[in-house]
Design a protein with these regions (language model features):
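Register position in tetratricopeptide repeats
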Residues: 61, 95, 129-130, 163-164, ...
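Residue-level recognition of tetratricopeptide repeat
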Residues: 57, 91, 125, 159, ...
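Structural marker of alpha-solenoid helical repeat scaffolds
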Residues: 78, 111-113, 145-146, 179-181, ...
Length: 584
């Protein structure tokens, strides 16, 4: 929920107990490893253990928690008394989804530090799985309410109280939580309604859901709509449930996720409940917090929370989908694809998971597999445009431009949104590359009409006009506008330099093309452009150097032939006639 995101941004002290003091150079959260751990490992057990320790650390540093956990398991099996290995091993096992093993290690951790937040949260999840709600409450009592724990602990405590038969106490706890921070109204309303509904108190559930919706403003969550619509349908308020779902659909017209509820109501049935037990409620709490940690780019913490949620609801499509998203961001594509592959394809999340699987196949250079999957999806749901659009993107990137145009045409036929500049832009690119300029120009102009200041459109259309020698003054102004918006984009800088070159302003062209090469040093076209500008600026040796450099960067065969001719003194750049030159 939007409001929960705002709250988390304000209270996070990285209090899950697994965050580092800073970020790794790549932007990924740095793994938590004290230097003393490393030195201690070396001194205590020698090089074999040291190697496994380093292997575990390296796997963790690149986000491969499964491998890191395996190395840590070997290390612990051989050296159970190694200093602090239980804490590290517990974190890695939880990150890898090996919750049973993580819980065993958590027992060791709390034996040395009974207030360790992550270990106690893992043991709380295990207690919920065992329906031991008093044990869950005991573990939650040990967690200090700092950072994100100020949200997740009260939510989990409410569910444990409800599981222990203390529904009134659970609902009061959630009301008190709202009183401390009104922005938590949506999530406390949702969970209060779920607890009351599950405990057989429909009137209290209705009141809680109503408060939650009021607190949500225009950002009512899917879970809220699903849960409240189900309650209304069971309470013989079918029409009110339908209106609730219709209102959500109006503000979220493209989503499939509401489809099961909408279909059930259309058939006069009661939608499936959001939760069927108290462990489900705990999982829902963990999932909500994991989702917002992920949005805040705190992926290491999000991964542990979602793995705990998955332990409580192993086949949850929503949980598996979020797990896949987090793993993708951690560059663990194969593991992410396993998560996506575990989602029932008949569910709405199964549709989105297959879109992500197709993208994964493309990334793995299995484009044919991605294309087959997307074509099957296009046939499966003839009313949807997203699979056709993805197919167009994949084919365009693979330079299969005519096929890409066909896929984009299908997407347009199915799209309810005629004001999507991105679709006009991407089809315009494919059309231009397929040498269908008239259609391409119409699409690019339409994209520009819809998004007048969009730098990508300004640059592409402007560059295309320059290449054709059309509308040069307007093209230059468009590209200058794009440069102002994206000054660090080497391709846009190249477009401006090339525009100046085509206008005969070689000194200014050189300045801008040198900047473009500095931003994108490995692009053969930009280096070739700079070579041409150097040549006409009278800097012949530098021109030859740039052309030679361009050849080393494996340009397309046609471009390569032109560059080789220039190096042989053939087809050399020719200056623009003086009468056609324009000042900047």
């Amino acid at each position: 929920m939007r409001t929960l995101c705002a709250v988390i941004a304000g209270v996070i002290g990285l209090g899950v107990g697994v965050s580092g003091a800073g970020a790794a150079p790549s932007g990924r959260e740095a793994p938590v490893v004290d230097q003393a751990d490393l030195i201690g490992a070396s001194l205590q057990v020698g090089e074999t253990v040291f190697g496994k320790f380093l292997a575990s650390r390296y796997a963790e540093s690149v986000g491969d928690f499964a491998a890191a956990a395996s190395f840590a398991a070997q290390l612990m099996a051989e050296n159970p008394d190694l200093k602090d290995i239980a804490r590290r091993g517990h974190m890695l096992m939880a990150s890898a989804g090996r919750i049973a093993e993580a819980a065993e290690l958590a027992e060791q951790v709390v034996a040395g530090n009974e207030r360790d937040p992550l270990a106690n949260m893992t043991l709380t999840a295990r207690a919920f799985a065992r329906e031991d709600y008093r044990e869950a409450l005991k573990r939650l009592d040990k967690i200090e309410l700092t950072g994100i724990q100020r949200i997740i602990v009260p939510l989990m405590r409410a569910w444990a109280l409800a599981g222990d038969g203390r529904t009134d106490a659970a609902l009061v706890l959630l009301e008190d939580l709202t009183a401390t921070n009104a922005l938590l109204g949506p999530i406390t309303g949702l969970h209060g309604g779920l607890i009351a509904d599950l405990s057989g108190r429909p009137e209290a559930a209705d009141a809680a859901f109503t408060r939650g919706i009021a607190a949500s403003g225009e950002s009512v969550s899917l879970q809220m709509v699903e849960a409240y619509a189900g309650l209304l349908a069971r309470s013989n308020q079918h029409e009110k449930a339908v209106r609730l779902v219709e209102a959500f659909t109006l503000t979220n017209p493209r989503t499939l996720l509401i489809e099961p509820v909408r279909t059930a109501l259309a058939e006069g049935k009661v939608p499936e409940p959001v939760v069927t037990g108290f462990a489900d409620g705990a999982a829902e709490s963990l999932h909500a917090v994991a989702n917002q940690l992920y949005r805040e780019r705190l992926r290491a913490q999000a991964l542990i929370m979602i793995q705990l949620a998955l332990h409580l609801r192993p086949e949850s499509p929503a949980t598996l989908f979020l797990l896949g998203q987090i793993l993708e961001r951690e560059e663990q594509l194969e593991t992410a694809m396993e998560a996506y592959g575990g989602i029932d394809t008949s569910t709405p999340y199964g549709w989105y998971a297959r879109l992500n699987l197709a993208d994964g196949y493309r990334t793995q250079d299995h484009l044919d597999k991605a294309v087959r999957l997307l074509r099957a999806m296009i046939r499966e749901r003839p009313e949807r445009s997203d699979a056709a659009r993805a197919l167009g993107d994949f084919l365009r990137i693979d330079e299969r431009y005519r096929e890409a145009v066909s896929a984009y045409d299908t997407a347009f036929e199915r799209s309810a949104d005629a004001a999507d500049w991105r679709l006009f832009y991407t089809r315009g690119i494919a059309l231009e590359r397929a040498k269908k300029w008239e259609r391409a120009e119409r699409d690019l102009l339409k994209a520009l009409e819809l998004e007048p200041d969009q730098p990508l459109v300004l640059n592409y259309l402007g560059y295309s006009w320059i290449e054709q020698g059309h509308n040069l003054d307007r093209a230059k102004k468009m590209i200058e506008k794009a440069v102002l918006q994206r000054p660090q984009d080497g391709y846009i800088a190249d477009s401006l330099g090339w525009a100046l070159y085509r206008l005969g302003n070689y000194p200014e062209a050189v300045i801008n093309l040198e900047r473009a090469v500095a931003l994108e040093p490995g692009d053969p076209i930009i280096n070739d452009h700079l070579g041409d500008a150097y040549w006409l600026a009278g800097r012949r040796e530098e021109a030859r150097f740039q052309w030679t450099r361009s050849l080393s960067q494996e340009p397309e065969p046609k471009v390569e032939d032109i560059i080789r001719d220039k190096l042989k003194g053939k087809q050399l750049p020719q200056p623009v006639p003086a009468k056609q030159r324009r000042d900047i």
